[in-house]
Protein backbone atom coordinates (compact mmCIF):
# COMPACT_ATOMS: atom_id res chain seq x y z
CA UNK A 1 0.00 0.00 0.00
CA UNK A 2 1.26 3.48 -0.91
CA UNK A 3 1.84 6.19 1.69
CA UNK A 4 -1.20 8.46 1.63
CA UNK A 5 0.53 11.69 0.65
CA UNK A 6 -1.40 13.55 -2.02
CA UNK A 7 0.56 13.94 -5.24
CA UNK A 8 -0.63 17.52 -5.71
CA UNK A 9 0.49 20.67 -3.92
CA UNK A 10 -2.50 23.02 -3.80
CA UNK A 11 -0.09 25.77 -2.69
CA UNK A 12 0.97 26.24 -6.32
CA UNK A 13 -2.57 26.31 -7.73
CA UNK A 14 -3.81 29.25 -9.76
CA UNK A 15 -6.55 31.43 -8.28
CA UNK A 16 -9.12 29.67 -10.45
CA UNK A 17 -7.94 26.19 -9.37
CA UNK A 18 -8.03 27.25 -5.71
CA UNK A 19 -11.53 28.67 -6.03
CA UNK A 20 -12.70 25.45 -7.71
CA UNK A 21 -11.44 23.32 -4.79
CA UNK A 22 -13.72 25.26 -2.46
CA UNK A 23 -16.70 25.26 -4.87
CA UNK A 24 -19.56 23.48 -3.09
CA UNK A 25 -21.52 21.19 -5.39
CA UNK A 26 -25.30 20.84 -5.28
CA UNK A 27 -26.79 17.35 -5.08
CA UNK A 28 -30.08 16.05 -6.47
CA UNK A 29 -32.62 16.55 -3.67
CA UNK A 30 -33.23 12.78 -3.32
CA UNK A 31 -29.60 12.48 -2.09
CA UNK A 32 -30.01 15.27 0.46
CA UNK A 33 -32.86 13.52 2.29
CA UNK A 34 -33.75 10.04 3.52
CA UNK A 35 -34.34 7.68 0.59
CA UNK A 36 -35.13 4.09 -0.24
CA UNK A 37 -34.28 2.07 -3.34
CA UNK A 38 -37.11 0.71 -5.47
CA UNK A 39 -36.72 -1.77 -8.30
CA UNK A 40 -37.95 -1.40 -11.85
CA UNK A 41 -39.22 -4.20 -14.11
CA UNK A 42 -36.89 -7.04 -15.23
CA UNK A 43 -34.39 -5.97 -17.89
CA UNK A 44 -33.33 -7.54 -21.18
CA UNK A 45 -30.31 -6.75 -23.42
CA UNK A 46 -29.52 -4.32 -26.25
CA UNK A 47 -29.27 -7.31 -28.60
CA UNK A 48 -29.14 -11.15 -28.56
CA UNK A 49 -30.68 -11.50 -25.06
CA UNK A 50 -30.44 -15.32 -25.19
CA UNK A 51 -26.66 -15.17 -25.64
CA UNK A 52 -26.26 -12.47 -22.96
CA UNK A 53 -28.34 -14.63 -20.57
CA UNK A 54 -25.89 -17.53 -21.12
CA UNK A 55 -22.86 -15.29 -20.51
CA UNK A 56 -24.33 -13.68 -17.37
CA UNK A 57 -26.49 -16.36 -15.71
CA UNK A 58 -26.32 -14.64 -12.31
CA UNK A 59 -27.00 -11.08 -13.47
CA UNK A 60 -29.11 -11.21 -16.62
CA UNK A 61 -32.61 -9.81 -16.29
CA UNK A 62 -32.01 -7.96 -13.03
CA UNK A 63 -34.09 -4.79 -12.68
CA UNK A 64 -32.81 -1.25 -12.63
CA UNK A 65 -32.85 0.57 -9.28
CA UNK A 66 -34.22 4.03 -8.47
CA UNK A 67 -33.68 6.16 -5.38
CA UNK A 68 -36.94 7.69 -4.10
CA UNK A 69 -37.65 9.86 -1.04
CA UNK A 70 -38.61 8.07 2.18
CA UNK A 71 -39.59 9.11 5.70
CA UNK A 72 -36.42 7.57 7.15
CA UNK A 73 -33.23 6.12 5.70
CA UNK A 74 -33.66 2.46 4.81
CA UNK A 75 -29.90 1.76 4.82
CA UNK A 76 -27.89 1.06 7.97
CA UNK A 77 -25.77 4.16 8.67
CA UNK A 78 -23.71 2.16 11.20
CA UNK A 79 -22.54 -0.31 8.56
CA UNK A 80 -18.85 0.29 7.91
CA UNK A 81 -18.06 -0.47 4.29
CA UNK A 82 -14.79 -1.18 2.55
CA UNK A 83 -14.98 0.09 -1.01
CA UNK A 84 -12.38 0.03 -3.79
CA UNK A 85 -12.43 2.15 -6.92
CA UNK A 86 -10.52 2.21 -10.17
CA UNK A 87 -10.14 4.61 -13.10
CA UNK A 88 -10.01 2.72 -16.38
CA UNK A 89 -9.12 3.86 -19.92
CA UNK A 90 -8.50 7.37 -21.23
CA UNK A 91 -8.85 10.47 -19.08
CA UNK A 92 -12.06 12.51 -18.97
CA UNK A 93 -12.73 15.71 -16.99
CA UNK A 94 -14.67 15.00 -13.80
CA UNK A 95 -13.18 11.66 -12.75
CA UNK A 96 -11.89 13.13 -9.49
CA UNK A 97 -15.41 14.30 -8.65
CA UNK A 98 -16.80 10.78 -9.02
CA UNK A 99 -14.22 9.76 -6.39
CA UNK A 100 -15.16 12.76 -4.20
CA UNK A 101 -18.84 11.80 -4.48
CA UNK A 102 -18.19 8.20 -3.37
CA UNK A 103 -16.01 9.42 -0.48
CA UNK A 104 -18.57 11.99 0.69
CA UNK A 105 -21.39 9.43 0.51
CA UNK A 106 -19.44 7.13 2.82
CA UNK A 107 -18.64 10.03 5.19
CA UNK A 108 -22.27 11.16 5.28
CA UNK A 109 -24.15 7.85 5.26
CA UNK A 110 -21.77 5.08 6.37
CA UNK A 111 -19.37 6.64 8.87
CA UNK A 112 -16.15 4.78 9.55
CA UNK A 113 -16.07 3.27 6.05
CA UNK A 114 -12.78 2.93 4.15
CA UNK A 115 -12.19 3.91 0.52
CA UNK A 116 -9.29 2.43 -1.45
CA UNK A 117 -8.07 3.74 -4.81
CA UNK A 118 -6.38 1.19 -7.07
CA UNK A 119 -3.40 2.75 -8.82
CA UNK A 120 -2.83 2.70 -12.56
CA UNK A 121 -6.14 1.22 -13.65
CA UNK A 122 -7.23 -2.46 -13.54
CA UNK A 123 -3.56 -3.53 -13.20
CA UNK A 124 -3.76 -2.00 -9.71
CA UNK A 125 -6.54 -4.44 -8.83
CA UNK A 126 -4.60 -7.43 -10.17
CA UNK A 127 -1.38 -6.39 -8.39
CA UNK A 128 -3.20 -5.16 -5.26
CA UNK A 129 -1.50 -1.78 -5.70
CA UNK A 130 -3.67 0.73 -3.85
CA UNK A 131 -3.79 3.81 -1.65
CA UNK A 132 -6.26 4.53 1.13
CA UNK A 133 -8.14 7.69 0.17
CA UNK A 134 -8.62 10.17 3.02
CA UNK A 135 -10.21 13.63 3.19
CA UNK A 136 -6.77 15.29 3.08
CA UNK A 137 -5.61 13.13 0.18
CA UNK A 138 -8.71 13.89 -1.91
CA UNK A 139 -8.99 17.62 -1.05
CA UNK A 140 -6.58 19.09 -3.68
CA UNK A 141 -8.31 17.11 -6.45
CA UNK A 142 -11.87 18.33 -5.87
CA UNK A 143 -13.32 19.89 -9.05
CA UNK A 144 -9.92 19.49 -10.75
CA UNK A 145 -9.21 17.83 -14.09
CA UNK A 146 -7.13 14.75 -14.73
CA UNK A 147 -6.94 11.22 -13.35
CA UNK A 148 -3.67 11.73 -11.47
CA UNK A 149 -5.13 11.13 -8.01
CA UNK A 150 -4.65 7.40 -8.64
CA UNK A 151 -3.96 7.36 -12.42
CA UNK A 152 -5.57 5.11 -14.99
CA UNK A 153 -4.60 2.25 -17.28
CA UNK A 154 -5.89 0.22 -20.21
CA UNK A 155 -5.36 -3.30 -18.83
CA UNK A 156 -8.32 -5.66 -18.86
CA UNK A 157 -9.23 -8.36 -16.38
CA UNK A 158 -9.97 -11.16 -18.85
CA UNK A 159 -8.14 -14.44 -18.24
CA UNK A 160 -8.98 -16.93 -15.46
CA UNK A 161 -5.65 -16.03 -13.78
CA UNK A 162 -6.52 -12.33 -13.85
CA UNK A 163 -9.99 -12.95 -12.41
CA UNK A 164 -8.31 -14.99 -9.66
CA UNK A 165 -5.97 -12.06 -8.91
CA UNK A 166 -9.00 -9.75 -8.64
CA UNK A 167 -10.71 -12.22 -6.29
CA UNK A 168 -7.58 -12.38 -4.12
CA UNK A 169 -7.37 -8.58 -3.90
CA UNK A 170 -11.08 -8.33 -3.03
CA UNK A 171 -10.57 -10.95 -0.31
CA UNK A 172 -7.36 -9.43 1.05
CA UNK A 173 -8.96 -5.98 1.45
CA UNK A 174 -12.31 -7.49 2.53
CA UNK A 175 -14.09 -5.33 -0.06
CA UNK A 176 -17.84 -4.85 0.13
CA UNK A 177 -17.78 -3.12 -3.22
CA UNK A 178 -15.78 -1.96 -6.22
CA UNK A 179 -16.55 1.02 -8.48
CA UNK A 180 -15.21 0.88 -12.05
CA UNK A 181 -15.06 4.35 -13.62
CA UNK A 182 -14.67 3.87 -17.37
CA UNK A 183 -16.08 3.68 -20.90
CA UNK A 184 -17.88 0.92 -22.78
CA UNK A 185 -15.04 -1.64 -22.60
CA UNK A 186 -14.34 -0.91 -18.92
CA UNK A 187 -18.01 -1.25 -17.98
CA UNK A 188 -18.25 -4.53 -19.92
CA UNK A 189 -15.30 -5.64 -17.77
CA UNK A 190 -17.08 -4.39 -14.64
CA UNK A 191 -20.08 -6.56 -15.50
CA UNK A 192 -17.87 -9.62 -16.06
CA UNK A 193 -16.26 -8.98 -12.65
CA UNK A 194 -19.67 -8.63 -10.99
CA UNK A 195 -20.80 -11.91 -12.58
CA UNK A 196 -17.58 -13.66 -11.53
CA UNK A 197 -17.76 -12.44 -7.92
CA UNK A 198 -21.42 -13.45 -7.63
CA UNK A 199 -20.78 -16.90 -9.16
CA UNK A 200 -18.10 -17.47 -6.46
CA UNK A 201 -20.42 -16.16 -3.71
CA UNK A 202 -18.01 -13.34 -2.88
CA UNK A 203 -19.50 -10.39 -1.02
CA UNK A 204 -17.80 -7.81 -3.29
CA UNK A 205 -20.37 -5.96 -5.40
CA UNK A 206 -19.41 -4.06 -8.59
CA UNK A 207 -20.89 -0.79 -9.87
CA UNK A 208 -19.87 1.08 -13.05
CA UNK A 209 -19.75 4.81 -13.84
CA UNK A 210 -20.11 6.16 -17.43
CA UNK A 211 -16.90 7.90 -18.54
CA UNK A 212 -15.74 8.94 -21.99
CA UNK A 213 -15.21 12.26 -23.71
CA UNK A 214 -16.27 10.57 -26.97
CA UNK A 215 -19.90 10.63 -25.79
CA UNK A 216 -20.56 7.12 -27.15
CA UNK A 217 -21.57 5.45 -23.88
CA UNK A 218 -25.20 6.44 -23.41
CA UNK A 219 -28.75 5.13 -23.47
CA UNK A 220 -32.17 6.26 -22.22
CA UNK A 221 -31.22 5.77 -18.55
CA UNK A 222 -27.64 7.07 -18.96
CA UNK A 223 -28.21 10.28 -20.97
CA UNK A 224 -24.51 11.18 -21.33
CA UNK A 225 -21.04 10.05 -20.35
CA UNK A 226 -19.03 12.39 -18.17
CA UNK A 227 -16.24 14.47 -19.70
CA UNK A 228 -18.05 15.03 -23.02
CA UNK A 229 -19.41 18.42 -21.92
CA UNK A 230 -16.01 19.77 -20.82
CA UNK A 231 -14.00 18.37 -23.74
CA UNK A 232 -16.41 19.79 -26.33
CA UNK A 233 -16.34 23.22 -24.67
CA UNK A 234 -12.52 23.22 -24.65
CA UNK A 235 -12.38 22.26 -28.34
CA UNK A 236 -15.13 24.74 -29.22
CA UNK A 237 -13.20 27.58 -27.59
CA UNK A 238 -10.17 26.72 -29.77
CA UNK A 239 -12.31 26.31 -32.91
CA UNK A 240 -13.91 29.70 -32.21
CA UNK A 241 -10.43 31.25 -31.91
CA UNK A 242 -9.34 29.65 -35.19
CA UNK A 243 -12.51 30.99 -36.88
CA UNK A 244 -11.70 34.55 -35.87
CA UNK A 245 -8.13 34.00 -37.09
CA UNK A 246 -9.42 32.73 -40.45
CA UNK A 247 -11.67 35.73 -40.81
CA UNK A 248 -8.89 38.12 -39.73
CA UNK A 249 -6.27 36.94 -42.25
CA UNK A 250 -8.78 36.01 -44.93
CA UNK A 251 -6.45 33.46 -46.54
CA UNK A 252 -6.48 30.13 -44.68
CA UNK A 253 -8.73 27.09 -44.58
CA UNK A 254 -8.32 25.44 -41.18
CA UNK A 255 -8.85 21.66 -41.23
CA UNK A 256 -9.53 20.58 -37.64
CA UNK A 257 -9.51 16.89 -36.72
CA UNK A 258 -11.33 16.20 -33.45
CA UNK A 259 -10.94 13.28 -31.06
CA UNK A 260 -13.48 10.47 -31.25
CA UNK A 261 -12.15 7.16 -32.61
CA UNK A 262 -15.57 5.66 -33.31
CA UNK A 263 -18.56 7.99 -33.05
CA UNK A 264 -18.61 11.59 -34.36
CA UNK A 265 -20.45 13.07 -31.33
CA UNK A 266 -17.64 15.51 -30.45
CA UNK A 267 -17.46 16.82 -34.02
CA UNK A 268 -21.25 17.27 -34.16
CA UNK A 269 -21.41 19.02 -30.78
CA UNK A 270 -18.54 21.37 -31.66
CA UNK A 271 -20.29 22.19 -34.95
CA UNK A 272 -23.49 23.08 -33.06
CA UNK A 273 -21.45 25.29 -30.71
CA UNK A 274 -19.36 27.11 -33.34
CA UNK A 275 -21.06 26.92 -36.82
CA UNK A 276 -18.11 25.94 -39.08
CA UNK A 277 -18.34 26.12 -42.88
CA UNK A 278 -17.98 22.37 -43.36
CA UNK A 279 -18.44 19.47 -40.94
CA UNK A 280 -17.94 15.85 -41.94
CA UNK A 281 -19.95 13.37 -39.83
CA UNK A 282 -18.58 9.82 -40.15
CA UNK A 283 -21.94 8.12 -39.65
CA UNK A 284 -23.44 10.10 -42.56
CA UNK A 285 -20.48 9.21 -44.80
CA UNK A 286 -21.10 5.52 -43.98
CA UNK A 287 -24.88 5.74 -44.46
CA UNK A 288 -24.47 7.39 -47.87
CA UNK A 289 -21.63 4.98 -48.78
CA UNK A 290 -19.44 7.92 -49.78
CA UNK A 291 -15.98 7.33 -51.22
CA UNK A 292 -12.97 9.43 -50.24
CA UNK A 293 -13.29 11.25 -53.57
CA UNK A 294 -16.92 12.15 -52.73
CA UNK A 295 -15.83 13.71 -49.42
CA UNK A 296 -13.03 15.61 -51.19
CA UNK A 297 -15.40 16.85 -53.92
CA UNK A 298 -17.92 18.06 -51.33
CA UNK A 299 -15.23 20.12 -49.57
CA UNK A 300 -13.89 21.47 -52.88
CA UNK A 301 -17.39 22.42 -54.10
CA UNK A 302 -17.95 24.55 -50.98
CA UNK A 303 -14.48 26.15 -51.31
CA UNK A 304 -15.25 27.09 -54.94
CA UNK A 305 -18.66 28.56 -54.04
CA UNK A 306 -17.08 30.56 -51.22
CA UNK A 307 -14.36 31.82 -53.60
CA UNK A 308 -17.11 33.13 -55.91
CA UNK A 309 -18.43 35.12 -52.92
CA UNK A 310 -14.95 36.49 -52.20
CA UNK A 311 -14.20 34.21 -49.22
CA UNK A 312 -10.89 32.35 -49.51
CA UNK A 313 -10.91 31.13 -45.94
CA UNK A 314 -12.95 28.85 -43.72
CA UNK A 315 -13.04 26.18 -41.02
CA UNK A 316 -13.62 22.47 -41.62
CA UNK A 317 -14.26 19.92 -38.84
CA UNK A 318 -13.31 16.27 -39.34
CA UNK A 319 -13.90 13.37 -36.90
CA UNK A 320 -10.85 11.34 -35.90
CA UNK A 321 -12.58 8.11 -36.95
CA UNK A 322 -13.52 9.26 -40.48
CA UNK A 323 -11.32 6.64 -42.19
CA UNK A 324 -13.20 3.85 -40.37
CA UNK A 325 -16.48 4.98 -41.94
CA UNK A 326 -15.32 4.72 -45.57
CA UNK A 327 -15.73 1.11 -46.81
CA UNK A 328 -13.29 1.47 -49.75
CA UNK A 329 -10.54 2.62 -47.36
CA UNK A 330 -11.27 -0.31 -45.05
CA UNK A 331 -11.03 -2.69 -48.02
CA UNK A 332 -7.71 -1.15 -49.11
CA UNK A 333 -6.29 -1.46 -45.58
CA UNK A 334 -7.42 -5.11 -45.33
CA UNK A 335 -5.76 -5.89 -48.68
CA UNK A 336 -2.55 -4.09 -47.70
CA UNK A 337 -2.42 -5.99 -44.39
CA UNK A 338 -2.75 -9.27 -46.28
CA UNK A 339 -0.16 -8.40 -48.98
CA UNK A 340 2.40 -6.93 -46.58
CA UNK A 341 2.14 -9.94 -44.28
CA UNK A 342 3.57 -12.12 -47.07
CA UNK A 343 5.39 -9.85 -49.51
CA UNK A 344 8.23 -7.38 -49.51
CA UNK A 345 7.30 -4.07 -51.12
CA UNK A 346 9.45 -3.67 -54.24
CA UNK A 347 10.32 -0.20 -55.46
CA UNK A 348 9.07 -1.03 -58.93
CA UNK A 349 5.57 -1.41 -57.51
CA UNK A 350 4.95 -4.97 -58.78
CA UNK A 351 3.26 -5.76 -55.44
CA UNK A 352 0.44 -3.38 -56.45
CA UNK A 353 -0.78 -5.95 -58.98
CA UNK A 354 -2.11 -7.93 -56.02
CA UNK A 355 -4.55 -5.13 -55.14
CA UNK A 356 -8.06 -5.29 -56.57
CA UNK A 357 -8.73 -2.66 -59.24
CA UNK A 358 -10.88 -0.55 -56.87
CA UNK A 359 -8.23 -0.58 -54.13
CA UNK A 360 -5.45 0.19 -56.61
CA UNK A 361 -7.44 3.15 -57.95
CA UNK A 362 -7.92 4.47 -54.39
CA UNK A 363 -4.25 3.91 -53.50
CA UNK A 364 -3.11 5.89 -56.56
CA UNK A 365 -5.62 8.63 -55.65
CA UNK A 366 -4.05 9.11 -52.20
CA UNK A 367 -1.25 11.67 -51.67
CA UNK A 368 2.24 10.12 -51.79
CA UNK A 369 2.89 10.94 -48.10
CA UNK A 370 -0.23 8.97 -47.11
CA UNK A 371 0.74 6.09 -49.42
CA UNK A 372 4.07 5.89 -47.61
CA UNK A 373 2.38 6.07 -44.22
CA UNK A 374 0.12 3.15 -45.16
CA UNK A 375 3.15 1.14 -46.27
CA UNK A 376 5.57 1.92 -43.46
CA UNK A 377 3.61 2.56 -40.25
CA UNK A 378 2.72 -0.89 -38.90
CA UNK A 379 1.62 -1.97 -35.44
CA UNK A 380 3.28 -4.93 -33.61
CA UNK A 381 0.85 -7.28 -35.41
CA UNK A 382 1.98 -5.96 -38.80
CA UNK A 383 -1.24 -4.05 -39.47
CA UNK A 384 -1.64 -0.54 -40.84
CA UNK A 385 -1.91 1.94 -37.95
CA UNK A 386 -5.12 3.68 -38.97
CA UNK A 387 -5.07 5.95 -35.90
CA UNK A 388 -1.77 7.45 -37.04
CA UNK A 389 -3.16 8.58 -40.40
CA UNK A 390 -3.47 12.35 -40.13
CA UNK A 391 -6.78 12.66 -41.95
CA UNK A 392 -6.74 16.46 -41.88
CA UNK A 393 -3.38 16.59 -43.71
CA UNK A 394 -4.51 13.94 -46.17
CA UNK A 395 -7.65 15.93 -47.01
CA UNK A 396 -5.67 19.18 -47.44
CA UNK A 397 -3.43 17.46 -50.01
CA UNK A 398 -6.39 15.90 -51.83
CA UNK A 399 -8.26 19.22 -51.89
CA UNK A 400 -5.13 20.95 -53.28
CA UNK A 401 -4.91 18.39 -56.09
CA UNK A 402 -8.59 18.75 -57.03
CA UNK A 403 -8.48 22.56 -56.90
CA UNK A 404 -5.44 22.52 -59.20
CA UNK A 405 -7.47 20.48 -61.69
CA UNK A 406 -10.33 22.96 -61.49
CA UNK A 407 -7.92 25.85 -61.98
CA UNK A 408 -6.75 24.26 -65.21
CA UNK A 409 -10.39 23.81 -66.26
CA UNK A 410 -11.01 27.49 -65.45
CA UNK A 411 -13.68 26.81 -62.79
CA UNK A 412 -11.54 28.01 -59.83
CA UNK A 413 -9.43 31.14 -59.94
CA UNK A 414 -8.60 31.82 -56.28
CA UNK A 415 -5.75 30.74 -53.97
CA UNK A 416 -6.01 27.95 -51.38
CA UNK A 417 -3.88 27.57 -48.26
CA UNK A 418 -4.66 24.80 -45.78
CA UNK A 419 -3.71 24.74 -42.09
CA UNK A 420 -4.03 21.48 -40.15
CA UNK A 421 -4.92 21.01 -36.48
CA UNK A 422 -5.65 18.04 -34.21
CA UNK A 423 -7.57 18.84 -31.04
CA UNK A 424 -7.48 15.79 -28.79
CA UNK A 425 -5.42 15.50 -25.63
CA UNK A 426 -6.07 19.19 -24.83
CA UNK A 427 -9.66 18.29 -23.92
CA UNK A 428 -9.16 15.24 -21.71
CA UNK A 429 -7.92 16.80 -18.47
CA UNK A 430 -9.26 20.36 -18.34
CA UNK A 431 -10.98 21.78 -15.27
CA UNK A 432 -14.44 20.19 -15.47
CA UNK A 433 -17.38 22.45 -16.30
CA UNK A 434 -20.05 23.10 -13.68
CA UNK A 435 -22.17 20.48 -15.46
CA UNK A 436 -19.48 17.76 -15.43
CA UNK A 437 -18.40 18.64 -11.87
CA UNK A 438 -21.96 18.29 -10.57
CA UNK A 439 -22.91 15.31 -12.75
CA UNK A 440 -19.79 13.38 -11.68
CA UNK A 441 -20.31 14.17 -8.01
CA UNK A 442 -23.88 12.83 -8.27
CA UNK A 443 -22.68 9.71 -10.15
CA UNK A 444 -20.17 8.99 -7.37
CA UNK A 445 -22.70 9.62 -4.60
CA UNK A 446 -25.18 7.34 -6.39
CA UNK A 447 -22.53 4.60 -6.76
CA UNK A 448 -21.99 4.76 -2.99
CA UNK A 449 -25.72 4.40 -2.35
CA UNK A 450 -26.05 1.45 -4.75
CA UNK A 451 -23.16 -0.41 -3.10
CA UNK A 452 -24.48 0.42 0.38
CA UNK A 453 -27.77 -1.23 -0.60
CA UNK A 454 -25.98 -4.35 -1.87
CA UNK A 455 -26.55 -3.81 -5.59
CA UNK A 456 -24.15 -5.23 -8.18
CA UNK A 457 -23.80 -5.25 -11.97
CA UNK A 458 -25.41 -1.80 -12.34
CA UNK A 459 -24.11 1.41 -13.90
CA UNK A 460 -24.66 4.57 -11.86
CA UNK A 461 -27.41 6.55 -13.61
CA UNK A 462 -28.35 10.20 -13.10
CA UNK A 463 -31.21 11.47 -15.27
CA UNK A 464 -33.60 14.37 -15.98
CA UNK A 465 -30.46 16.41 -16.73
CA UNK A 466 -32.33 19.17 -18.54
CA UNK A 467 -33.94 20.18 -15.22
CA UNK A 468 -32.33 22.02 -12.26
CA UNK A 469 -29.90 19.80 -10.30
CA UNK A 470 -32.36 19.41 -7.40
CA UNK A 471 -34.75 17.62 -9.78
CA UNK A 472 -32.23 15.18 -11.25
CA UNK A 473 -33.18 11.52 -10.84
CA UNK A 474 -30.75 8.99 -9.36
CA UNK A 475 -30.46 5.22 -9.70
CA UNK A 476 -28.66 2.35 -11.38
CA UNK A 477 -29.18 0.57 -14.71
CA UNK A 478 -28.44 -3.12 -15.32
CA UNK A 479 -25.18 -3.31 -17.27
CA UNK A 480 -26.46 -6.41 -19.07
CA UNK A 481 -29.30 -4.28 -20.51
CA UNK A 482 -26.70 -2.25 -22.47
CA UNK A 483 -25.05 -5.36 -23.94
CA UNK A 484 -24.94 -7.22 -27.20
CA UNK A 485 -22.53 -9.89 -28.42
CA UNK A 486 -19.78 -9.90 -31.04
CA UNK A 487 -18.25 -12.98 -32.58
CA UNK A 488 -14.51 -13.06 -31.84
CA UNK A 489 -12.25 -16.08 -32.44
CA UNK A 490 -15.33 -18.28 -32.90
CA UNK A 491 -16.90 -17.30 -29.55
CA UNK A 492 -19.55 -14.82 -28.50
CA UNK A 493 -18.02 -11.95 -26.51
CA UNK A 494 -20.23 -9.50 -24.59
CA UNK A 495 -19.86 -5.84 -25.55
CA UNK A 496 -21.61 -2.64 -24.59
CA UNK A 497 -22.59 -1.26 -27.97
CA UNK A 498 -21.17 2.17 -28.74
CA UNK A 499 -23.88 4.81 -29.21
CA UNK A 500 -23.21 6.32 -32.64
CA UNK A 501 -24.55 9.60 -34.04
CA UNK A 502 -28.16 8.93 -35.06
CA UNK A 503 -28.97 10.55 -38.40
CA UNK A 504 -32.64 10.69 -37.37
CA UNK A 505 -31.77 12.17 -33.96
CA UNK A 506 -32.49 15.79 -33.01
CA UNK A 507 -28.81 16.95 -32.81
CA UNK A 508 -27.94 15.78 -36.34
CA UNK A 509 -31.24 17.04 -37.78
CA UNK A 510 -30.63 20.51 -36.35
CA UNK A 511 -27.10 20.55 -37.78
CA UNK A 512 -28.31 19.30 -41.18
CA UNK A 513 -30.95 22.05 -41.33
CA UNK A 514 -28.31 24.77 -40.85
CA UNK A 515 -25.17 23.50 -42.60
CA UNK A 516 -25.92 25.02 -46.02
CA UNK A 517 -26.29 28.45 -44.45
CA UNK A 518 -23.07 27.97 -42.44
CA UNK A 519 -21.21 26.84 -45.59
CA UNK A 520 -21.59 30.11 -47.49
CA UNK A 521 -22.40 32.69 -44.84
CA UNK A 522 -19.95 33.20 -42.02
CA UNK A 523 -22.10 32.46 -38.98
CA UNK A 524 -19.07 31.82 -36.77
CA UNK A 525 -19.64 31.59 -33.01
CA UNK A 526 -16.74 32.07 -30.60
CA UNK A 527 -17.93 30.48 -27.33
CA UNK A 528 -14.88 31.68 -25.38
CA UNK A 529 -13.33 29.86 -22.42
CA UNK A 530 -15.33 27.71 -20.00
CA UNK A 531 -17.16 29.90 -17.47
CA UNK A 532 -17.65 28.90 -13.83
CA UNK A 533 -19.83 31.88 -12.90
CA UNK A 534 -22.17 34.15 -14.82
CA UNK A 535 -23.59 33.74 -18.34
CA UNK A 536 -23.36 30.23 -19.79
CA UNK A 537 -21.69 28.75 -16.72
CA UNK A 538 -24.36 26.12 -16.08
CA UNK A 539 -25.32 25.37 -19.69
CA UNK A 540 -25.30 21.71 -20.75
CA UNK A 541 -24.23 20.57 -24.22
CA UNK A 542 -26.44 21.17 -27.28
CA UNK A 543 -26.41 17.41 -27.94
CA UNK A 544 -27.78 16.54 -24.50
CA UNK A 545 -30.46 19.23 -24.49
CA UNK A 546 -31.60 18.38 -28.03
CA UNK A 547 -31.74 14.65 -27.21
CA UNK A 548 -33.75 15.37 -24.07
CA UNK A 549 -36.08 17.67 -26.01
CA UNK A 550 -35.19 20.55 -23.66
CA UNK A 551 -34.49 22.94 -26.58
CA UNK A 552 -35.97 23.28 -30.05
UniProtKB/Swiss-Prot annotation:
Binding site for substrate: 212-214, 251-252, 259-261, 320, 425-428
EC number: 2.7.1.90
Pathway: Carbohydrate degradation; glycolysis; D-glyceraldehyde 3-phosphate and glycerone phosphate from D-glucose: step 3/4
Coiled-coil segments on the chain, per record: none
Binding positions for diphosphate per the UniProt entry: 90
Keywords associated with the record: Allosteric enzyme, Cytoplasm, Glycolysis, Kinase, Magnesium, Metal-binding, Transferase
Cofactor(s) needed: Mg(2+)
GO biological-process terms attached to the record: fructose 6-phosphate metabolic process
Residues noted as binding Mg(2+) in the record, renumbered to the chain: 184
Important for catalytic activity (site feature) positions: 211
Site entry (Important for catalytic activity and substrate specificity), positions: 185
Reaction(s) catalysed by this chain's protein: beta-D-fructose 6-phosphate + diphosphate = beta-D-fructose 1,6-bisphosphate + phosphate + H(+)
Matching InterPro entries: ATP_PFK (IPR022953), PfpB_PPi_PFK (IPR011183), Phosphofructokinase_dom (IPR000023), PKF_sf (IPR035966)
Keyword Magnesium: yes
Residue positions of the active site: 214 (proton acceptor)
Major enzyme class: transferase
Localization of this protein: Cytoplasm
Subunit structure: Tetramer of two alpha (regulatory) and two beta (catalytic) chains.
PANTHER family tied to this protein: PYROPHOSPHATE--FRUCTOSE 6-PHOSPHATE 1-PHOSPHOTRANSFERASE, PYROPHOSPHATE--FRUCTOSE 6-PHOSPHATE 1-PHOSPHOTRANSFERASE SUBUNIT BETA 1
Name under which the protein is recorded: Pyrophosphate--fructose 6-phosphate 1-phosphotransferase subunit beta
Organism: Ricinus communis
